[in-house]
């Protein structure tokens, strides 16, 4: 159900170790990417030049660390205020986008096939499956908590895709900061960018800390999360991350097969593999099937 530790169970530890390590790697990557994208948007809105971008990285990182140190159990009111503000501002943006029918229209191109776009879009929510379970694993009613999380996440994700596509068509821009500026949401846009970046990236960093505990039980997840945030800030300052296509393919190659095999085994084949430390057959199927898909992508017109 999740990648959190089950201490004393050697086989369980072996099974979860590989995906725990991969999960930490992808969460560190997401932390850096989110901070990088957030800093670009903040700097674009405030127009502070080259220095402004790394200052924005540090400020966003500091806010994420604050969220982590406050602790998930004490974030109730803070998260409620942040989410309410973000929700209201997003609705304001929706009214502007859908109330304005005079958009310029963004020209399409053939830089990415429809299938590739779908695959990369699916890779993101699939990579969040281990993250979601880090927050639902201790729920009093795990099934209801997981179902509610999945439905809400899916609905909001579709909403965000619609907003992004519509805003891009309206303004002729793909840069979220420029879209917000053209939408007349300069200050409100700044608040949206900062709140969405901090609240989302907090989840990445915190989950990386939780997953690290399943690799080394003596580690404290909160402090690992802080370290992950610091690494993310440094990476966001040093490395350009404008094109994350390869990163999305990487996590897609891990988490799409993982959940596909899990669903097929548990719900369709009804196989109980709890007694096995590692299922060699599934491990082999994983890279072979994904390599085959990538090799025949053009033939399938995806």
Label each PLM-derived region with a short phrase.
Residues 37-47, 61-82, 100, 134-140, ...:
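Membrane-water interface regions at transmembrane-helix termini and the short interhelical loops
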Residues 55, 59, 64-97, 108-109, ...:
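Membrane-interface loop-to-helix entry segments
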Residues 261-302:
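C-terminal membrane-solvent junction of multi-pass transporters and transport-like membrane proteins
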Residues 2-9, 13, 292, 299-301:
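Single conserved hydrophobic/aromatic residue that forms the stacking wall/gate
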Residues 17-24, 45-70, 84-94, 114-130, ...:
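Transmembrane alpha-helical segments of multi-pass small-molecule transport proteins
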Residues 96-100, 108-169, 181-202, 277-290:
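Hydrophobic, membrane-embedded alpha-helices of multi-pass small-molecule transporters
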Residues 10-14, 41-56, 73-82, 176-188, ...:
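Transmembrane helix-loop boundary segments of multi-pass membrane transporters
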Residues 16-48, 198-214:
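Hydrophobic transmembrane alpha-helices that form the core helical bundles
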């Amino acid at each position: 159900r999740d990648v959190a530790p089950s201490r004393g169970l050697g086989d369980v530890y072996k099974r979860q170790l590989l995906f725990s390590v991969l999960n930490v790697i992808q969460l560190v990557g997401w932390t850096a990417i989110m901070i990088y994208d957030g800093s670009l948007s903040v700097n674009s809105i405030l127009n502070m030049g080259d220095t402004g971008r790394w200052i924005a990285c540090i400020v966003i990182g500091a806010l994420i660390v604050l969220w982590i140190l406050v602790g998930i159990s004490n974030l109730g009111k803070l998260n409620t205020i942040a989410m309410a503000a973000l929700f209201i501002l997003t609705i304001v943006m929706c009214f502007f986008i859908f109330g304005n029918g005079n958009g310029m229209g963004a020209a399409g191109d053939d830089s990415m096939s429809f299938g590739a776009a779908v695959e990369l879009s699916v890779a993101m929510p699939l990579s969040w499956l281990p993250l979601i379970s880090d927050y639902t694993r201790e729920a009093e009613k795990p099934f209801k908590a997981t179902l509610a999380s999945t439905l809400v996440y899916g609905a909001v994700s579709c909403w965000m895709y619609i907003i992004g596509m519509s805003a891009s068509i309206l303004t002729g821009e793909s840069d979220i900061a420029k879209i917000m500026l053209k939408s007349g949401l300069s200050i409100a846009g700044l608040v949206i960018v900062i709140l969405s970046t901090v609240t989302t990236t907090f989840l990445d960093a915190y989950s990386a800390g939780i997953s690290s505990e399943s690799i080394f039980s003596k580690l404290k997840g909160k402090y690992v999360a802080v370290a992950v945030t610091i690494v993310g800030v440094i990476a966001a300052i040093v490395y350009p991350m404008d094109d994350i296509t390869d990163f999305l393919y990487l996590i897609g190659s891990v988490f799409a097969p993982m959940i596909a095999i899990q669903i097929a085994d548990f719900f369709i084949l009804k196989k109980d593999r709890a007694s096995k430390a590692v299922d060699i057959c599934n491990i082999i199927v994983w890279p072979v099937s994904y390599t085959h898909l990538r090799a025949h992508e053009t033939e399938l017109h995806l």
